[in-house]
């Protein structure tokens, strides 16, 4: 292990672990009004959609797998982009070809959770529960991409 790449990988592993831990607690521990699990329905598919690739990314970081870290970094970026698509596009732009119907927001009970952003008509408002997840996810994505870049730059420098 090269000492100069370990801090980047360790930071990414910690960020991913914190994000996954928060995601699991948030999906399965009722903390109303932070989350509203009563209206959300089963959360295991959602949890596993984050945990499986997240744990594989942590494993790749621990094993120093350049390709695994790169794929994991790609997943973290897609993970953040999907959250932006789900919450921020409807909030900022209203109905778009991607979001014509906002019943998921009202039926999922998200309108009853804590928010700090002002409402914008009948548009979904990103609640604190999801803003926290998005900040953790963005941090994990940035640190995992940084770890991937460091792994590849070290490999090309050694070649």
Where are the regions a protein language model picked out?
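Physicochemical signature of membrane-embedded alpha-helices that form the seven-helix bundle of GPCRs
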Residues: 45-49, 71-74, 78-81, 125-136
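Cytosolic juxtamembrane helix at the C-terminal end of the final transmembrane segment
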Residues: 93-97, 139-159
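Hydrophobic alpha-helical transmembrane segments
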Residues: 53-54, 111-140
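Interfacial segments of alpha-helical transmembrane regions
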Residues: 4-17, 60-79
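Transmembrane alpha-helical insertion/packing segments
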Residues: 1-50
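Juxtamembrane non-transmembrane "cap" segments at the membrane-aqueous interface
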Residues: 88-113
């Amino acid at each position: 292990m090269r000492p100069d790449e370990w801090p980047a990988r360790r930071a990414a592993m910690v960020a991913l672990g914190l994000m996954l831990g928060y995601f699991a607690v948030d999906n399965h521990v009722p903390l109303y009004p932070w989350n509203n699990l009563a209206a959300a329905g089963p959360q295991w598919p959602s949890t596993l959609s984050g945990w499986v690739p997240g744990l594989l990314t942590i494993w790749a970081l621990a094993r120093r797998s350049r390709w695994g870290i790169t794929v994991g970094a790609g997943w973290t970026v897609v993970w953040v982009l999907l959250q932006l698509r789900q919450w921020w596009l409807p909030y900022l732009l209203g109905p778009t070809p991607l979001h014509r119907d906002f019943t998921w927001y009202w039926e999922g009970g998200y309108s009853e959770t804590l928010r700090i952003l002002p409402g914008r008509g009948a548009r979904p408002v990103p609640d604190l529960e999801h803003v926290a997840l998005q900040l953790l996810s963005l941090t994990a994505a940035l640190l995992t991409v940084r770890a991937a870049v460091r792994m590849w730059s070290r490999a090309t420098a050694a070649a």
